[in-house]
C-alpha cells in the first residue's frame, strides 16, 4: 500500500499545516500523522481540513526543530497506544512511547484512543459502596464502585495528597488494576508518585507484569495537544483492563481534569475558534462528555474514576468545574477555610455530596448518623455570625451544647494520612466504615460531651480519641 505523504507548509506554535499533493488522499479528521526531526518521532493529529489539499494539525510534542518542507506520513488511523498487561509498571506518554527509560513497551494489543461510549444495553447500574478508610468521605459523601468521583479544590488545599491517599488505601487493598493519568500537573509529583509506588510494591521492577498500575503522563511542560489527549490515552488503557477479564474492577485516577479543559481551551484559541464564556472553548461540554461518558461500568467490569478538579480562584461556578459536576456520582469539595483551621483532609462536610447517601443503599443507621452530623454542623455555621458579634455567652444552653459538639465533630473529621507521614510524623490511619459510624453516632448523641476538643484532632477511631483524652488530662 502506498504511503500518503505530505509536506509541512506552516508552523505556528503547536499548530502545523500539512499540504498533500500529487492526487494523494487527504487524511481523515483525528488521523495521526508522523514526521521525524533529528531522528525524533513527532506525532501530529488532524483537526481541520483547509481547502482541497491542506490539513491543520495539533502537535503531540514540541515543534522545536520542525521546518517547512519537512515530509509527513499519514498513518491511516488515529493515535494508537499499547494496551493490556504489557503497560503494567510502566510510564508512557500520550502516543504510547515509554518515558521511564526502560525501553519500548512491547504489547501484542494496540488500541485507538478514540472509542464510542458503551451502549445503554451494555451498561451496568449496580451500586455498592467503595470503602476508602477516610472518615469524612465514607460517612458524608461515600464513593460507589464503578462511579465517577470529583475532588474539587483551589490551589494548595490538598487534592493531590487526597488522591495519593486514595491510591494508597484503595488501590493497594483492591485486587484489580489501577491506571493513573497525570494531566498537566507537576512533573515532580509524577516522579514522587512513581517512586512511592515502587517502595510500596504496587510497581514491581523485577517482574513488571506483577505490578498493579499503569501510568500515563502528559505534564505541565508538554504542549497543549498532549495535555488535551493524555486523559483519553489513560482511559483507553483502563477500558482494556475492564474488558479483558470478566468482573474486573479498574481504578482510574486523573490529576487534573481542569488541565484537560485548559489544554482544550489553548488548542481552540490556536485554531482560531471564537471563545465562549470566560474564554473557554465553545466545545467545552462536548469535550467533557466525550471523556466522561466512556468512564462507566459494563456487564464485563467497572471503571471507578477519581478525578482531581482544580477550581480557579475557588469559584465553583467557573464553567470548567461546573461542566464536570453533571457527570459525577460523588463530589468531595476541599475548602480553604477548613485548611486554615489545620483540619486535614480539608473536606467541606456541607458542600460535599454523593448520590449513594441513600438509606436504600448505605442503610438506615449510616444515613441517619450522616444527616445528624450535617445538621449539627449546619446549625454551628448559622450561629457563627452571632458568636463573632456577641460572643458565646449570648447563646442559649442548647446552642452552646450544639457548638461544642460541632467543634468536636469538625476535629474528628480530620485524620492522619499514610502518604503524609513524612511531613507530619504521625502514623496514617485507615478507619473501617463501622468504626466511623459508631464514633460519629456517639458524638451526636452526646456520649463524649465530657472529652476535650483536642482529643478528637488527628485520630482514627473514637477509641483513639478516648485514649488521647486520658493523656491530655
From Swiss-Prot:
GO terms for molecular function: ATP binding; ATP hydrolysis activity; proton-transporting ATP synthase activity, rotational mechanism. It is an enzyme of class 7 (translocase). It catalyses: ATP + H2O + 4 H(+)(in) = ADP + phosphate + 5 H(+)(out). Its EC number is 7.1.2.2. One of its GO terms (cellular component) is plasma membrane. It comes from the Bacteria. ATP binds at residues 153-160. It is found in: Cell inner membrane. It is a peripheral membrane protein. Gene3D superfamilies: 2.40.10.170, Bovine Mitochondrial F1-atpase, Atp Synthase Beta Chain, Chain D, domain 3 (1.10.1140.10), P-loop containing nucleotide triphosphate hydrolases (3.40.50.300). InterPro entries: AAA+_ATPase, ATP-synt_VA_C, ATP_synth_F1_bsu, ATPase_a/bsu_AS, ATPase_alpha/beta_chains, ATPase_F1/V1/A1_a/bsu_N, ATPase_F1/V1/A1_a/bsu_N_sf, ATPase_F1/V1/A1_a/bsu_nucl-bd. Keywords: ATP synthesis, ATP-binding, Cell inner membrane, Cell membrane, CF(1), Hydrogen ion transport, Ion transport, Membrane, Nucleotide-binding, Translocase, Transport. CDD domains: ATP-synt_F1_beta_C, ATP-synt_F1_beta_N, F1-ATPase_beta_CD. F-type ATPases have 2 components, CF(1) - the catalytic core - and CF(0) - the membrane proton channel. CF(1) has five subunits: alpha(3), beta(3), gamma(1), delta(1), epsilon(1). CF(0) has three main subunits: a(1), b(2) and c(9-12). The alpha and beta chains form an alternating ring which encloses part of the gamma chain. CF(1) is attached to CF(0) by a central stalk formed by the gamma and epsilon chains, while a peripheral stalk is formed by the delta and b chains. NCBIfam families: atpD (TIGR01039). Belongs to the ATPase alpha/beta chains family. Produces ATP from ADP in the presence of a proton gradient across the membrane. The catalytic sites are hosted primarily by the beta subunits. This is ATP synthase subunit beta. It comes from Rickettsia canadensis (strain McKiel). The lineage of its organism: Bacteria, Pseudomonadati, Pseudomonadota, Alphaproteobacteria, Rickettsiales.
Amino acid at each position: 500500500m502506498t504511503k500518503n505523504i505530505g509536506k509541512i507548509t506552516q508552523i505556528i506554535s503547536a499548530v502545523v499545516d500539512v499540504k498533500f499533493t500529487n492526487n494523494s488522499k487527504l487524511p481523515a479528521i483525528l488521523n495521526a500523522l508522523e514526521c521525524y526531526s533529528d531522528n525524533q518521532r513527532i506525532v501530529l493529529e488532524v483537526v481541520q481540513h483547509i481547502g482541497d489539499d491542506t490539513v491543520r494539525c495539533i502537535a503531540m510534542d514540541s515543534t522545536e526543530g520542525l521546518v517547512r518542507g519537512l515530509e509527513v506520513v499519514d498513518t491511516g488511523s488515529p493515535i494508537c497506544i499499547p494496551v493490556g498487561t504489557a503497560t503494567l509498571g510502566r510510564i508512557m506518554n500520550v502516543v504510547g512511547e515509554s518515558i521511564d527509560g526502560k525501553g519500548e513497551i512491547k504489547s501484542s494489543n494496540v488500541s485507538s484512543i478514540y472509542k464510542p461510549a458503551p451502549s445503554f444495553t451494555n451498561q451496568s447500574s449496580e451500586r455498592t459502596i467503595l470503602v476508602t478508610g477516610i472518615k469524612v468521605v465514607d460517612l458524608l459523601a461515600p464513593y460507589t464502585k464503578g462511579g465517577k468521583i470529583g475532588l474539587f479544590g483551589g490551589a494548595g488545599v490538598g487534592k493531590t495528597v487526597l488522591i495519593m491517599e486514595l491510591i494508597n488505601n484503595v488501590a493497594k487493598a483492591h485486587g484489580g488494576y489501577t491506571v493513573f493519568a497525570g494531566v498537566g500537573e507537576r512533573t515532580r509529583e509524577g516522579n514522587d508518585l512513581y517512586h512511592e509506588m515502587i517502595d510500596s510494591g504496587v510497581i514491581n521492577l523485577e517482574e513488571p507484569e506483577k505490578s498493579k498500575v499503569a501510568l500515563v503522563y502528559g505534564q505541565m511542560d508538554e504542549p497543549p495537544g498532549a495535555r488535551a489527549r493524555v486523559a483519553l490515552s489513560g482511559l483507553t488503557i483502563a477500558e482494556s483492563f475492564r474488558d479483558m477479564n470478566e468482573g474486573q474492577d479498574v481504578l482510574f485516577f486523573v490529576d487534573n481534569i481542569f488541565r484537560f479543559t485548559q489544554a482544550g481551551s489553548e488548542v481552540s484559541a490556536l485554531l482560531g475558534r471564537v471563545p465562549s464564556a470566560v474564554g473557554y472553548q465553545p466545545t467545552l461540554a462536548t469535550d467533557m462528555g466525550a471523556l466522561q461518558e466512556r468512564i462507566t461500568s459494563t456487564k464485563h467490569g467497572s471503571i471507578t474514576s477519581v478525578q482531581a478538579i482544580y477550581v480557579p480562584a475557588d469559584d465553583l461556578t467557573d464553567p470548567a468545574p461546573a461542566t464536570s459536576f453533571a457527570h459525577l456520582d460523588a463530589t468531595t469539595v476541599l475548602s480553604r477555610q477548613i485548611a486554615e483551621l489545620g483540619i486535614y483532609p480539608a473536606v467541606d462536610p456541607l458542600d460535599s455530596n454523593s448520590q449513594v447517601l441513600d438509606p436504600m443503599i448505605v442503610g438506615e443507621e449510616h444515613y441517619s448518623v450522616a444527616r445528624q452530623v450535617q445538621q449539627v454542623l449546619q446549625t454551628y455555621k448559622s450561629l457563627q455570625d452571632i458568636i463573632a458579634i456577641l460572643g458565646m455567652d449570648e447563646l442559649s444552653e442548647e446552642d452552646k451544647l450544639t457548638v461544642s459538639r460541632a467543634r468536636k465533630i469538625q476535629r474528628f473529621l480530620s485524620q492522619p494520612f499514610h502518604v503524609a507521614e513524612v511531613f507530619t510524623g504521625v502514623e496514617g490511619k485507615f478507619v473501617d466504615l463501622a468504626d466511623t459510624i459508631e464514633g460519629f453516632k456517639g458524638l451526636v448523641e452526646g456520649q463524649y460531651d465530657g472529652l476535650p476538643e483536642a482529643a478528637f484532632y488527628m485520630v482514627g477511631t473514637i477509641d483513639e480519641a478516648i485514649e488521647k483524652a486520658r493523656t491530655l488530662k
